[in-house]
C-alpha cells in the first residue's frame, strides 16, 4: 500500500494535472461567490443546513456544520476550505480517470487530455463559483470512483458493484447534479465489455440499477426524515434520462465544443 502511494506521488502526471487545475481555477482562490452563495451568510446556519438536508445533500449539510463547529464559519475561512477540497478533488478525479483509460487509448496525448476535458468543462467551471464548490467537485471524484469500481465489476468480480453503488450514493448525498457523469462514462465500458446483445442488455440493466438505487435511497431518506421532502420535488426519471442523454451528446459528439465533433467516438 505504501509503495502504491509513493508511486502516485512520484508520477509526473499528478503534478501536471495539478498545474492545469491551478491555471484554470487559481484565480478563484479569492473570495468571490455566485449570487446564491451569499444566502449562506445571510441567514442562520441551521436554516441553510436544513435546506441542504431537504435537498438530499447530507454531506453538504455536514460540511457546513463542521465548518461552523471548528470555527471555520466565516466567509473567508469556509471559502478557503471549500476551495482546497475542490482543487484536490479535481486533480484526483483527472488522475484517476487518466489511469483508467490510458490502457484503452493508444495515443498518449489523447489519453492525457481526455480526463481534462471531462472533468474541467463548462459545467465544473460553473460549480467553482459556488461556496460549496468543494463538496460539488468531491461528488465528481466520487462519480469517477464509481466508474472505476463499475469497470472492475465488468472485468472481474460483480462484488465491486456494491462499492460502485456506495460511491454513487455518496455522490447523491454530496450534489446530485453530477450523477449523470457516472452513466455517461460507464456506458462506454458497457459497450466495451459486452460480448453479445444479451450481455449488452444485462450490463445496461446493471448500470441502471447502480444509478437508480442510490437515487431512490437518497429520496427515501429525505422523505422519511424531513417533512417537506426534497425542495425540488420528487424524482423525475424521464427528465433524468433526458438530461443524461444531453450530457452524453455534449461529451461524445460535441466534445463540449473544445475539439472537433465525434473525436471521442473515433478514439
Question: What annotation goes with each model-predicted range?
Answer:
Residues 91, 137-148, 164, 181:
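Alpha-helical transmembrane segments of multi-pass membrane proteins
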Residues 23-90, 130-134, 168-169, 173-190, ...:
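Transmembrane catalytic cores of multi-pass membrane glycosyltransferases
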Residues 143-161, 195:
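Membrane-interface transmembrane helices that cradle and orient dolichyl/undecaprenyl
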Residues 73-85, 106-113, 156-163, 167:
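Membrane-interface starts of transmembrane alpha-helices
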Residues 84-105, 145, 149:
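Transmembrane-helix motifs of polytopic, lipid-linked glycan transferases
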Amino acid at each position: 500500500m505504501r509503495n502504491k502511494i509513493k508511486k502516485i506521488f512520484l508520477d509526473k502526471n499528478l503534478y501536471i494535472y495539478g498545474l492545469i487545475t491551478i491555471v484554470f481555477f487559481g484565480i478563484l482562490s479569492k473570495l468571490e461567490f455566485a449570487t446564491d452563495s451569499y444566502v449562506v451568510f445571510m441567514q442562520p446556519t441551521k436554516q441553510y443546513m436544513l435546506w441542504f438536508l431537504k435537498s438530499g445533500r447530507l454531506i453538504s449539510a455536514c460540511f457546513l456544520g463542521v465548518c461552523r463547529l471548528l470555527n471555520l464559519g466565516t466567509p473567508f475561512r469556509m471559502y478557503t476550505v471549500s476551495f482546497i477540497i475542490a482543487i484536490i478533488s479535481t486533480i484526483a478525479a483527472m488522475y484517476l480517470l487518466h489511469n483508467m483509460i490510458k490502457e484503452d487509448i493508444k495515443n498518449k496525448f489523447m489519453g492525457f487530455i481526455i480526463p481534462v476535458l471531462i472533468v474541467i468543462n463548462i459545467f465544473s467551471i460553473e460549480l467553482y463559483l459556488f461556496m460549496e464548490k468543494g463538496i460539488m467537485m468531491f461528488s465528481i471524484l466520487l462519480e469517477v470512483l464509481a466508474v472505476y469500481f463499475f469497470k472492475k465489476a465488468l472485468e472481474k468480480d460483480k462484488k465491486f458493484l456494491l462499492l460502485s453503488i456506495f460511491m454513487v450514493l455518496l455522490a447523491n448525498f454530496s450534489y446530485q447534479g453530477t450523477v449523470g457523469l457516472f452513466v455517461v462514462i460507464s456506458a462506454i465500458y458497457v459497450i466495451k465489455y459486452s460480448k453479445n446483445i444479451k450481455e449488452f442488455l444485462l450490463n445496461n440493466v446493471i448500470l441502471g440499477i447502480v444509478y437508480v438505487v442510490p437515487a431512490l435511497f437518497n429520496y427515501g431518506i429525505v422523505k422519511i426524515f424531513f417533512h417537506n421532502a426534497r425542495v425540488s420535488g420528487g424524482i423525475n426519471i424521464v427528465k433524468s434520462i433526458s438530461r443524461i442523454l444531453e450530457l452524453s451528446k455534449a461529451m461524445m459528439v460535441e466534445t463540449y465544443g473544445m475539439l472537433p465533433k465525434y473525436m471521442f467516438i473515433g478514439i
